[in-house]
Amino acid sequence: MLRKLEKQDFDRYVEFAYELALDMTKSGYPTYADGIKTKNDFITREREAFSRDGEEILLFEQDGKVNGWIHYYHLPEDHYLDTTSFCVAEGMSEAVSEFMAFARENFSGSELYLGFPKENIEAVEALNACGFECIEESYNNVMNFEQYMQQPESADVIPITRENFQLFADIHSQYDDDMYWTSQRILNAIDGWRVFVFIREGKAAGAIYSRIFEDKTMSEIFGVDFPDGIYDGRVYRELLTAVLNDEKRMGTKHMVFFCDEESQSDALACGFHCVGEYVCFQKKL
């Protein structure tokens, strides 16, 4: 069964949840086994469940024993439901089924997204059994900027601002129907993003967009776009070099980047380190 975690019981169970979060076979995404995020990061984010609208932590119990911890958040205006942690010591299949039933009852009409390490075989099998669609499989790569040396940059790569944003929108808009971070949403929050495009014959031949997190020590590349989705290895590497150099100068400490099979070798060549494989599932409630 699932029951709401009350604020006064947070300290009683958070250590248990964190230990599970370090084990990719027992937890979901975001992972805390990447060598970047800390125990303090986990505790701070999980505690926010008691101060943010649309968030709640559920304890998963079997025979009176707490075996799991699920922290979800709901964005009603976007009909979006996701989790910040999905940690289960035993009974992952049952936990997934019960959370699915809970979500259907409370958030009908929303899209539920659940991300897990590919190493969490029980979770992946349970999601498939519940009729979820796998919408992404990728490599989870990290960059430690202490180990990164700036590289020569191409003059064909330029930064994007509000003034020249249309160059980026021209290429990114082809994906607007398939992702949360549409061109308009990125523009609305542009101060928290680093965006670059590769210009060829006056047009964008590729674009990269990285989100800077609030403490400005960590970022994530959310995507690299190409016209008609046709991959160009040279453009990809030049865009990566530009954003890596930029964030090195800014003082960013770590970067996360999820890559597909086609681009993984180029990401590794630019200095990223792979910590595991990620799978994302989606289901309409």
Predicted regions and their residues:
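A mid-sequence, solvent-exposed acidic-amphipathic segment
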Residues: 172-209, 214
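Short amphipathic alpha-helix that is part of the acyltransferase structural core
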Residues: 1-41, 138, 148-180
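Gram-positive cell-envelope targeting signals
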Residues: 5, 13-18, 99-100, 115-117, ...
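Acyl-donor-binding surface of acyltransferase catalytic domains
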Residues: 89-153, 239, 254-285
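Compact recognition or signaling/catalytic modules
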Residues: 200-285
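Conserved donor-binding loop and adjoining core beta-sheet/short helix segment
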Residues: 28-98, 200, 204-233
